[in-house]
């Protein structure tokens, strides 16, 4: 085990959705935040064993996630139809963007694996993920969330 050999590395894959929340994303965003919190706690617990922990956050990555977002039907609770239409439209618009990441992802993962950092690190891959992370840090929680609300709930 890592503790027995006194070194090792965990690279946990997550999403910028752990830091940036959108309407109707309760389950998705909360699981991504859970990976972030879990990883940070692991880093504290394992640092004395020379075991590093980092997370890699993607934004819009080359997956079928957006294609699998579905609208509710008449047999389901439809109170959110208007909002679901808006969010679905936003996801459809961005589904083709920023999806040329496989090479960048592979290079970043190899770089992290070859150069473990003793301190916990979050790595962000992709233009949209980096932009969201920077904007949230620059504007702070209150202003950033105001912008998200204006953009998604208008």
Residues of each region from the PLM?
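Active-site loop immediately N-terminal to the catalytic Tyr-X3-Lys motif
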Residues: 20-26
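Active-site helix of classical SDR
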Residues: 31-34
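Active-site-adjacent segment of SDR/Rossmann-fold oxidoreductases
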Residues: 2, 20, 41-52
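Non-catalytic terminal and boundary segments that flank Rossmann-like NAD(P)-dependent oxidoreductase
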Residues: 142-154
């Amino acid at each position: 085990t890592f503790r027995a050999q006194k070194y090792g590395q965990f690279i946990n894959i997550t999403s910028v959705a752990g830091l940036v929340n959108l309407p109707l994303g309760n389950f998705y965003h909360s699981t991504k935040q859970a990976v972030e919190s879990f990883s940070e706690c692991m880093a504290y617990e394992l640092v004395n064993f020379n075991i590093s922990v980092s997370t890699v956050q993607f934004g819009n990555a080359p997956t079928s996630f957006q294609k699998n977002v579905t609208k509710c039907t008449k047999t389901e609770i439809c109170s959110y139809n208007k909002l679901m239409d808006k969010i679905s439209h936003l996801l459809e618009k961005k589904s083709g963007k920023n999806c040329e990441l496989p090479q960048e992802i592979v290079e970043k993962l190899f770089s992290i694996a070859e150069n473990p950092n003793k301190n916990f690190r979050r790595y962000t891959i992709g233009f949209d993920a980096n932009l969201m992370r920077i904007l949230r840090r620059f504007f702070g929680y209150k202003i950033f969330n105001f912008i998200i609300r204006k953009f998604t709930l208008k």
